[in-house]
């Protein structure tokens, strides 16, 4: 965004909101001269100042950068859903948007330019602000290796198509040969300017839960049967691989000890939690402890760059496998029954991804952990043989009570609050199912409505709380402050 366009926008918003220059300067904590300099286009506000401007005018960063400043841009009306293969992606952590996505983008760019001798990559938005913590720069260099690669972090640019935007340049003999503008939009999926991605193709006819449920009732089928009819019987081979990876991740996480990488000094807790059974432990306490241990195991493996499955993202990947494995062991469900539950969960995740977002950089942690909780509640509902109405209520309930949840990872690492949050969401998914057993008939809010609400809420969140590590715990935490 040009400096002068910043000035025009600020002046327009002042007029619309009836805020004087002096009052706005006080709100922002800057001088009137500084504000005037912005308005004239002589200087540009810092990223923190832009975040404060967004808060002052009740705008998201996206709307401030791209919109008129008067109303929210609407998400395009979707047409169907992608394959569930785009929901569950097997890869390495710690972040589907900050490691898996950039890795894919770099791989595509490298294949396009096999004969160059230098790459330059510029990270913008959340990729820049939390890229070091997530290891984005490391994965970029590793993927483009052995070609000489420099990575730059641009913290100021805001006129971006997505908060996770990166730009790549290829050189031969110091001459620019090619460039690419790309976005990592969550769950390991990417968009590239000027390139049609095969994975973006919709294969499901319906894009709302209402329509899917009506179709299932009309044809007397379960959601997983709708998946099988659409994807083909080989989808079970894919889901078998997904489930195997999920279980292996829990097993590895439970058996590994030590300190997680990144400098925050977080110790692994999954194995300790799993072994801490007490002689007077109630069945309910044991259930919570084991489910949490499984969720911690996945979260810790992800934080260490281990092999995980996005569900819907790396940062929220511990919720679904934790609950599925616990109930498989408790009730003896077959692998095929678990796979059917995973198919059901994937449809819920795709509905959120299509009609809202699963990206913490776009809509905060509600988009990641809230979606994971909803997916897990729906999967559990399928395992328990619940009705479509009960499954919908459980999934809706799971998202509703994560609305407004912030994404403010300390040091930009997927550790605090991310790992513990997976465990809490796993327990919440079970609570949502328990409520659905009794209260489904009295519900007033649909799953489609709560997904729409989540998207609007996410766009209203300050950029500080959308995976930029510039607000909340990420801002206030200091390693010298000890817990009493």
Please give the residue ranges for each predicted region.
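A short, Lys/Arg-rich alpha-helix, primarily the initiator
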Residues: 1-17
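Short alpha-helical DNA-recognition segment
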Residues: 18-37
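DNA major-groove recognition helix of helix-turn-helix/homeodomain DNA-binding modules
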Residues: 48-63
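Short, charged recognition helix plus adjacent turn
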Residues: 55, 65-78
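A structural-propensity feature for long, helix-poor, extended segments
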Residues: 118-154, 343-381, 388-394, 400-432
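C-terminal regulatory domains involved in ligand/effector binding and gene-expression control
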Residues: 143, 149-281, 289-290
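Accessory "access/gating" subregions that flank catalytic or transport cores
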Residues: 247-364, 472-484
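Functionally critical mobile loop/hinge segments
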Residues: 380-484
